[in-house]
Amino acid sequence: MEHTKNLEDVEVQRFSAFERFIHWLVAISFLYLFFSGLGIYSPKFSWLLAVLGGKEFSAWLHPIAGIVYSVGVFLMFLKWAKDFILDADDIKWLKGAKHYIKGEEEKLPEAGKYNAGQKLFGWIVFIGSAVFLVSGLVMWFPNSFSITLVRWAILLHEIAFIVVGAGFIVHVYMGTIGVPGSLSSMITGKVSALWAASHHPKWFKQIIGRG
């Protein structure tokens, strides 16, 4: 019990200021893109555009926000792509992901700085964002492309929206309610040693020199 209390009182650095900056750059721009895109695409959600400055303004700002988002994701890729490479333990983790959902992390292979679910979401974001960028550019300048290509771009944009959007919702849940303490790491950059040892034991052992 005393050991656990001591770990609660010790903080470890998880994210740098730059890492937090690009995370929030991507998160905020994606939120705008998500809601403005929903309003532009579906009449049922057109009321969102009034909140976001009107239809014409949203149609103008959406692709610009898309460029900002793409730059942020590119910086993420440069920073984290190597860390998101899946290994054998990650495959085992994904096969037993039900234990993570149930809060039974002790039944899974020890996670490093990022668990397999976070790594998988990272690749969903990287690939989905590449689709967003290419298809979005075609949709932004439709007169420069054939109608067939524009239609394919719209379809791919919609598919990427569904896949990345679903992953984003899960990510927000797990980063707040699902795993308490996660959100603070993207605000202050720090987590308690107990949090690190409980959720990312392999990483914790590495930073204290036991890995």
Descriptions of predicted regions:
Residues 1-211:
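Membrane-embedded alpha-helical bundles that constitute the cytochrome b-like, heme-associated redox core
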